[in-house]
Amino acid sequence: MSKVAQALTIAGSDSGGGAGIQADLKTFQMRGVFGTSVITAVTAQNTLDVFDIHTIPLQTIQSQLKAIADDFTISAFKIGMLGTAEIIECVAEALNQYHFGTLVLDPVMIAKGGAPLLQQSAVDSLNTFLLPLADVITPNLPEAKALTGVEVIDDQTAQQAAQILQARGVKTVVIKGGHSAHSQSAVCRDWVFTPSAQFTLESPRYATAQTHGTGCTFSACMTAELAKGVSVEQAIKTAKDYITAAISHPLNIGHGHGPTNHWAYQNKM
């Protein structure tokens, strides 16, 4: 049996390569983990916009999940873009049948350019079917508000939102502060709530548009570390360092919200 850690991403494809499945697999590779994938949607997008979304038929999603379960030893996996309530319920049903290890749920709802990636009707399905299965959830501020109704602006409101999510079954909540209305602040703060501890992670806030795929990359790095057997707290801290390096060393690709730099963290080591 191989000693190489294996991880899975269940998400949408980004033709521009900056987010989704493409960002996840790049991150897995950079963190020394063999990556597998289940594609839930094919998007036509670049750094400027999302032009088309084609959701994958449920039977094809089920077949992909079975193919991975039958042949790979997955020790951690992440879920990104699912798009519809039907896909959410399809994936949740499969997760009750197959064991893929620790689940990191990135509740993808809106693309960096503003295009919706999750139907509003699917938010209830996300809360009902996937939150109880999640070991870690990584919402940004708009996603945290959509899931809980709480507008996170400080430590107190972050704790309120986290308590709601944990009451629904999530073990660890990471609320990402990059979308803060106080974006003039020089610091970007994330709030972390585990079953036994709570703490914040801070990094410089960079004035850059090269942030496409940051959420995908952050959760993918966390998933890769968990696949290697790292503790949840250490996986979160490594993911924070990884994405900070990726944002602070932009590639300047494209004419809009450009992708992050997946080589940056390794190059600084």
Language model features: what each stretch is:
Residues 32-36, 198-199, 225-239:
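Phosphate-handling active-site elements
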Residues 89-97, 186-189, 195-197, 228:
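Nucleotide and nucleotide-moiety/phosphate-recognizing core
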